[in-house]
Regions:
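Acidic (Asp/Glu)-rich catalytic clusters
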Residues: 54-63, 97-104, 133-152, 206, ...
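Generic enzyme active-site microenvironment
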Residues: 83-84, 151
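A short, conserved beta-to-alpha structural element at the edge of catalytic cores
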Residues: 103-126
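C-terminal active-site subregion of NodB/CE4 polysaccharide deacetylases
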Residues: 2-83, 89-94, 162-169, 173-189, ...
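Acidic/aromatic-lined carbohydrate-recognition and catalytic surfaces
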Residues: 84-89, 93, 102, 111, ...
Length: 279
């Protein structure tokens, strides 16, 4: 029921933003470019065909660009970035061959302490996808360097909002340094495990040396504003998403939830203080 309700809200929101875009185009002659970053996890064997279909749709309605791409003056109206959190082996088997044979850029965010090991958290599994192993160092090195960008997903895939400052610092620095030593390049990108963060984490990541970090809050990351934001949202995509749900997601229908997450973060500290006073 919860999923259906969220779907209906997203459908309504998509209609609202479509009307808004139309009015801006008619009244002001304004037509904004939009960039949306997609966030995948596992690509199970039985969902490979669906994943390929999704990529074909993205290429029909827009352009798939690398995560280090910044939109400037262009006639293209929609851009998409493809990211994979966790680095499950299923992406090597079921996603990478198609991506690389079609010259599609993508990014993989690795929790470095689990390279070559079975993931302990497993918050996402496909139907025919048992506990998966994270790709190892050799598999990372074999990825096409012209298409694949490797980023940090912390060291141990912990929930940052539940650990102290010192541990946060270790997680951010260790994963960055391990990947930099392995690839002999700078690692400027971070994907936040579970997508949960606070302002202190954002500032810490900046101080550690990351140039861009990704949450799991759905939103357009670029809209002709000229900003190259440090903190960027992403829309969660599953290869088993129904086709209509996928279309609504990539057109921005689920972006309303980013406003909900921001409001929740603002309210949470206030409620915590009130409960402390009562105690």
């Amino acid at each position: 029921m919860k999923g259906h309700f969220k779907f209906l809200i997203s459908l309504f929101y998509l209609i609202v933003i479509a009307i808004k875009s139309l009015l801006l185009r008619i009244l002001l002659g304004r037509s904004d470019c939009k960039l949306l970053t997609l966030n995948y996890h596992s690509i199970p064997n039985d969902q490979k065909a669906n994943f390929i279909w999704q990529l074909k749709i993205l290429r029909k309605i827009g352009e798939i660009v690398p995560i280090d791409f910044t939109v400037k003056n262009t006639k293209t109206k929609r851009f998409f970035k493809i990211t994979f959190d966790d680095g499950f082996e299923s992406i090597i088997n079921n996603a990478v061959p198609y991506l690389e044979s079609n010259n599609i850029p993508y990014a993989v965010f690795i929790p470095t302490a689990y390279m070559g090991k079975v993931a302990k958290w497993q918050h996402y599994n496909g139907k025919n996808n048992p506990d998966e192993t994270i790709i190892n160092k050799n598999q990372i090195l074999k990825l096409n360097k012209d298409l694949a960008i490797i980023g940090s997903h912390s060291a141990h895939h912990l929930k940052f909002t539940t650990i102290p400052y010192d541990q946060r610092l270790i997680e951010l620095k260790e994963s960055k340094e391990v990947l930099e030593d392995l690839l002999n390049i700078e690692i400027p990108f971070l994907s936040i495990p579970y997508g949960e963060y606070d302002n202190k984490l954002v500032e810490l990541a900046r101080n550690v040396g990351y140039s861009k970090i990704y949450s799991s809050e759905p939103e357009f990351t670029y809209n002709n504003s000229g900003n190259d934001n440090f903190l960027n949202g992403r829309i969660g995509i599953r290869p088993e998403d129904s086709r209509i749900r996928f279309i609504i997601k990539i057109l921005g229908g689920y972006n309303w939830s980013s406003k909900y997450f921001r409001l929740k973060r603002k309210i949470k500290p206030v409620l915590s203080k009130k409960s402390e006073r009562k105690a």
